[in-house]
Amino acid sequence: MSFSINGKTAIVTGAANGLGLAIARQFADKGANVMCADMDEKKLEEEWGGDSEDGSVRYFAGDLRQRLTIANLVSATIDSFERVDILVNGSRQMIETNALDVEDTSVSVLLEQNLMTALHLTQHVARRMIKQGADQPEGQLGSIINLSSIAARHTRPELMGYSIASAALEQMTRSMALALASERIRVNAVAFGSVMSASLQSSVIEHSEWRDDIRAHTPLGRIASPAELTDAVQFLAAESSCFITGEVITIDG
């Protein structure tokens, strides 16, 4: 089986920075058509404005917590590339939780951003994959990859909301994998350890001790760069993983 994604069409959310940006760049470099989605239109323009003149890359700015925005993203992808083969749900947010504050809304905010956005986009994209595969009697119709975190299993008090949302995303991955298997659509997740994303950069600025703590509890003794983790996502997107679904691959050093 091949690791190639050449000629495939992918939607990558969270593609304005960090891991989502690294995944989108690798996919484009490997010959895929890529629709880069994010809420930060200015950053999308900075990262992808020049590339969007190339026929293989487009970008879409919008709040994917809104269902109409999700529908518009899928429509824009079809208008640009006529199909969608791969979805990477990479849009994530990390905020702290005060477990004893009854006014704290972080759990509901993170469930909406990190779980429900991925679920709704998965539903829309899966419906499109099924429709475009109506005349394809065999072979996979699509691959969906959710970006999770080892916080789903290993947490700390202030990350309670993020951990709950990550665990829910992983269970959604397993459930959707079962629901879509008969449609020949695979659904998997990659759970990352410490990756120097924009959100982690902000966190270690506020909590300087976190950097040393992360390094001390990571056997390889360092924080990964986004570019180190993109091959696993490409593996799950490609035919090389055609008999893998419902799995959560952990990459944590």
Show which residues each predicted segment covers.
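Conserved glycine-rich Rossmann-like NAD(P)H-binding loop of the short-chain dehydrogenase/reductase
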Residues: 30-46
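Active-site helix of classical SDR
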Residues: 122, 165, 173
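C-terminal substrate-recognition "lid" of short-chain dehydrogenase/reductases
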Residues: 222-251
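Active-site loop immediately N-terminal to the catalytic Tyr-X3-Lys motif
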Residues: 100, 154-160, 182-183, 221, ...
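Residue(s) in the substrate-gating loop at a strand-loop-helix junction
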Residues: 149
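Substrate-binding pocket helix/loop in short-chain dehydrogenase/reductase
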Residues: 98-99, 103-111, 159, 214
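Alpha-helical segment proximal to the catalytic Tyr-Lys
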Residues: 127, 178-182, 242
